[in-house]
Design a protein with these regions (language model features):
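Extended intrinsically disordered or low-complexity regions, especially N/C-terminal cytosolic tails and loops
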Residues: 1-208, 220-302
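Acidic/aromatic/glycine-rich contiguous surface patches that form carbohydrate-binding/processing clefts
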Residues: 216
């Protein structure tokens, strides 16, 4: 293993980067237009979409003979549209999961303020960290419903159904995971036709995917940083073809499964097929799509 060395590469401006790409064998039909793109899109960000076009060994940074800058921008645009598509679908899941957690917990505990009551949680340190975050969200909020609550009521925190509107999905999932009452958690998971462990795993995947979409990160050929659980039993259709659970296709399947429990007549399948049809030159294989995926029962619905 080589010893680490100091970083000594110099920063290069857009015009120099265009020349660098040309020297490495990338065809650029309109260098001035490519230069404009590189002035608005960080080269390091764009290089992720160049990587599939490199010859092996990729460390030599030589492009395949048919590689063109147009392909780079096509992959970039496809990834952007995929990101927006996934985010829009996840939004529906986020709202449904928040509602399920608040509904089941408030009904079971008979306490409107359970979210800020330590007695309902396993780990007191995690609870305190969450409480600090909740306090911060309430204090900084400019929402009219928060202003109304502060003006009208003497309680230090709003009830759970109001707090749920202020916090990110990741925090809501952490609150769920820290709940003491296992039966309540099982009931929440069953609302989405899942066993508790699978629900926990899949909600983590959905949260990580949502965060990638929010931060404009690459999702097209990115691998999951954790392995999602494979369900043994589901109440709705699930995939049967062998699929790589680390690839975005598996994430899309998880999203579709949740949507089928929330809105059985959803059109996610149609929208995904339309997106792929609009970018026929994008190879679905690096995303983990198996041959015949569109014939799965999961994707035949909607």
């Amino acid at each position: 293993m080589n010893s680490p060395i100091p970083f000594q590469k110099e920063y290069q401006h857009a015009d120099a980067l265009v020349q660098l790409l040309l020297s490495r064998g990338l065809a650029i039909d309109n260098p001035s237009k490519a230069e404009q793109y590189l002035k608005t899109i960080n080269y390091y960000r764009l290089s992720a979409y160049m990587y599939p076009l490199l010859l092996v060994p990729k460390s030599e940074h030589r492009f395949k003979t048919d590689a063109n800058f147009r392909q780079v921008m096509m992959l970039y645009r496809f990834d952007k549209k995929l990101r927006l598509f996934m985010f829009n679908e996840i939004e529906k899941i986020e709202i449904a999961v928040r509602t399920a957690i608040v509904d089941e917990c408030t009904s079971a505990f008979g306490d409107s303020f359970w979210m800020t009551n330590a007695s309902y949680f396993i780990d007191s340190n995690k609870f305190l960290k969450t409480l600090v975050l909740l306090k911060h969200e309430v204090e900084k909020s400019r929402e009219e419903f928060i202003a109304h609550f502060k003006h009208t009521y003497s309680d230090p925190y709003p009830p759970a159904w109001i707090l749920a509107e202020l916090i990110p999905l990741g925090v809501m999932v952490n609150i769920f995971n820290n709940l003491k009452n296992a039966q309540v958690k099982k009931r929440i998971a069953l609302r989405f036709g899942l066993q508790l462990k699978v629900f926990n795993s899949w909600m983590t995947i959905i949260t990580l995917t949502r965060n990638s979409c929010c931060h404009h990160a690459r999702v097209w050929n990115k691998q999951n940083t954790m392995l999602p659980m494979v369900p043994h039993r589901t109440t709705h259709a699930w995939i049967t073809l062998p699929s790589n659970p680390l690839r975005v296709y598996y994430n899309l399947c998880i999203i579709k499964y949740f949507l089928d429990t929330i809105s059985p007549n959803n059109d996610m399948g149609k929208k995904l097929r339309d997106l792929l049809s609009a970018f026929l030159l994008v190879d679905p294989a690096p995303m983990g799509f198996p041959e015949g995926w569109e014939n799965e029962e999961l994707w035949e619905i909607g």
